[in-house]
Amino acid sequence: MEITVFYDYICPFSFIGSRRIQQIGAEYGIEVEWKGYQIHPEYPTQGKKRRQTFRAIRTAESLQSVMEEEEIKFKLPGFVTNSRLCLEAAEFSKTKGKFIEFHNLCYESYFLERKNIGDQDIVLAIGDKVGIDSDELEFNLKSGEMAGILESYRVEAEKIEVLGVPTVIFNDFRVHGVQSVETYRSIIAKFSN
């Protein structure tokens, strides 16, 4: 069984889905391949005020109940940001064997601490917390080395019609949006038979 996840750090559904997929991966001993997919490349790195539309309020309310199920004290940031630097740093963290720690801390920094993960200083601090040398990470981010990997993920996502994040692929079976742990288990059971 192969599991691939397309995710973005500014998507609260990716945050929830990530936790659930990590649980499933651990439960079944399946290594998960994580692929960063930037859903809003047009957003500025300094952030953009989150609009308070009826839809946004309803989404926040439904997220709140799901977060409570996950026992997360969730608070939707009042802004949205550009996740590119954080996604590039996540790719770099893979080369250091620190991906899951970095990945989880990116979500926590944005959704629990309301930090701007589009800001390079924040990204470097996250790296430092998980044991990645700040100077090395900064050099890598400035080099743009990981941008090519993200671009290859984007091309792949468009080719296989990833419509949003999270998108979880079990072998060749694609699931859009966050699902319950039970749903993920039933998908794995289906492919195990």
Task: Identify what each model region corresponds to.
Residues V5-I10:
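Aromatic-flanked redox-active Cys/Sec active sites in thiol-based oxidoreductases
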Residues E2-T4, I16-Y28, F54, L105-N193:
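C-terminal cap of thioredoxin/glutaredoxin-like
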Residues F15-E113:
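Structural alpha/beta surface segment adjacent to cysteine/selenocysteine redox centers
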